[in-house]
UniProtKB/Swiss-Prot annotation:
Gene Ontology biological process terms in this record: transcription by RNA polymerase II
Cited PROSITE patterns: RNA_POL_L_13KD
CDD domains found in the cross-reference section: RNAP_II_RPB11
Disulfide bonds: none
Function: DNA-dependent RNA polymerase catalyzes the transcription of DNA into RNA using the four ribonucleoside triphosphates as substrates. Component of RNA polymerase II which synthesizes mRNA precursors and many functional non-coding RNAs. Pol II is the central component of the basal RNA polymerase II transcription machinery. It is composed of mobile elements that move relative to each other. RPB11 is part of the core element with the central large cleft.
InterPro entries per the UniProt record, alphabetical: RBP11 (IPR037685), RBP11-like (IPR036603), RBP11-like_dimer (IPR009025), RNA_pol_Rpb11_13-16kDa_CS (IPR008193), Rpo11-like (IPR022905)
Entry GO terms, CC: RNA polymerase II, core complex
Name of the protein this chain belongs to: Probable DNA-directed RNA polymerase II subunit RPB11
Gene3D superfamilies, sorted: RNA polymerase, RBP11-like subunit
Length: 126
C-alpha cells in the first residue's frame, strides 16, 4: 500500500536550490512609502524570527515583522519601518550581527565541549 502524497507539495529541490537567475532577496517599498518589504527566498520561520527579533531591538527601527505567505513555499517577507535610515542597510547590519552572535555561540560551544572532553579524559585515567 502506497502512502498518499500532497498533490500541491513542491519538489524537495525547489525548497533547497535557488533557480539560476533568480534573486535571493528582493526589496519593495510599501504602498504608503514608509516601509521596506524584503522577500527572501529559500528561508522559513527560523531565520525570519531571528531577523525580526534583532530588528525589533535596533533603535533605528520603528517597526519590524515577518511572515511566511504560504506554508508550502520557503519564502518569507520581512517588513521594516526605519527611523530615517536605509532599510537595506538596517537589514544587512542586523544579519551581520546575527552571524557574529552565531559565530560566538559556536566558538563558545566548541570550547566548552573541548574542556569537558579534557576534564573527562583526566578523570578516566585515574
Amino acid at each position: 500500500m502506497s502512502v498518499p502524497t500532497l498533490s500541491n507539495k513542491p519538489e524537495n529541490v525547489d525548497l533547497l536550490v535557488l533557480p539560476h537567475g533568480e534573486e535571493k532577496v528582493k526589496c519593495q517599498i510599501s504602498d504608503k512609502g514608509d516601509c521596506n518589504i524584503f522577500t527572501i527566498k529559500l528561508e522559513d520561520h527560523t531565520i525570519g524570527n531571528l531577523i525580526k527579533q534583532s530588528l525589533c531591538q535596533d533603535p533605528k527601527v520603528t517597526f519590524a515583522a515577518y511572515r511566511q505567505p504560504h506554508p508550502l513555499q520557503n519564502v518569507i517577507e520581512i517588513t521594516i519601518r526605519p527611523k530615517g535610515y536605509a532599510g537595506v542597510k538596517l537589514l544587512s547590519d542586523n544579519v551581520h550581527t546575527i552571524l557574529n552572535q552565531v559565530s560566538t555561540l559556536r566558538e563558545t560551544f566548541v570550547n566548552k565541549v573541548q574542556k569537558y572532553k579534557e576534564k573527562n579524559a583526566c578523570h578516566g585515567n585515574r
